[in-house]
């Protein structure tokens, strides 16, 4: 009796049968598959914390073996970017303040929902690009973790850079007016 490969004229792919550390790649794949199958079967049936920890460790080890190193490095870099995702501390302090007289009785902070006028001395700031108003304390906490407006999710740092460039160009034009 002939094999499937012989009947269909398929030649054996040499890379499937390369010996790597004494076992072929196909054997390694079978081992990984059986480990993953056992892991997923037992994953929800753990009785103690130690079992769950060992299962998750095994899962991470298997995934690290299966994923290319370049992809692992890319994911680690993306995770590191997320840690320092907030605005500089000076950004919130530099935002323009809103005068108490310009606030309406119905104006509330969109983060904490506190009425601005309940406070005797409200510290209300406005984001320059979208003109959304927030309590300074609430916005400072938000901007320490994110670079977006809490309401519209627009990037506040990108607009700040554009505004700085525009004011610099305007100042340069004014200076040239003195000499012309």
Curated annotation (Swiss-Prot):
Q: Where is this region: Disordered?
A: 1-31
| Residues in RING-type zinc fingers | 109-153
Q: Does the keyword Zinc apply?
A: yes
User: From the UniProt record, which GO molecular function terms apply?
Assistant: ubiquitin protein ligase activity; zinc ion binding
Classification via SUPFAM superfamilies: RING/U-box
The protein's UniProt keywords, in alphabetical order, are: Acetylation, Metal-binding, Zinc, Zinc-finger
Checking InterPro entries in the record gives: RING-H2_zinc_finger, Znf_RING, Znf_RING/FYVE/PHD
Q: Does the keyword Acetylation feature in the UniProt annotation? A: yes
At what positions is N-acetylserine found?
2
Q: Which GO terms describe its cellular component?
A: cytoplasm
GO BP annotations listed: protein ubiquitination
Extra remark = Present with 195 molecules/cell in log phase SD medium.
Q: What is this protein called?
A: Uncharacterized RING finger protein YBR062C
């Amino acid at each position: 009796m002939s094999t499937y490969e012989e009947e269909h004229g398929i030649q054996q792919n040499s890379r499937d049968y390369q010996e790597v550390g004494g076992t072929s790649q196909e054997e390694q794949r079978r081992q990984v598959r059986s480990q993953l199958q056992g892991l997923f079967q037992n994953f929800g049936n753990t009785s103690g914390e130690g079992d769950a920890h060992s299962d998750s460790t095994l899962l991470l080890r298997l995934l690290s073996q299966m994923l290319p190193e370049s992809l692992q490095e890319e994911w680690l870099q993306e995770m590191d970017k997320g840690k320092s995702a907030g605005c500089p501390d000076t950004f919130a302090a530099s935002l323009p303040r809103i005068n108490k007289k310009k606030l309406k009785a119905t104006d509330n902070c969109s983060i904490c929902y506190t009425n601005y006028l309940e406070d005797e001395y409200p510290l209300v700031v406005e984001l320059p690009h979208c003109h959304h108003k927030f309590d300074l304390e609430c916005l400072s906490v938000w901007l320490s973790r994110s670079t977006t407006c809490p309401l519209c999710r627009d990037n506040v740092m990108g607009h700040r850079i554009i505004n700085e460039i525009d004011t610099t160009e305007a100042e340069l034009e004014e200076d040239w007016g003195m000499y012309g």
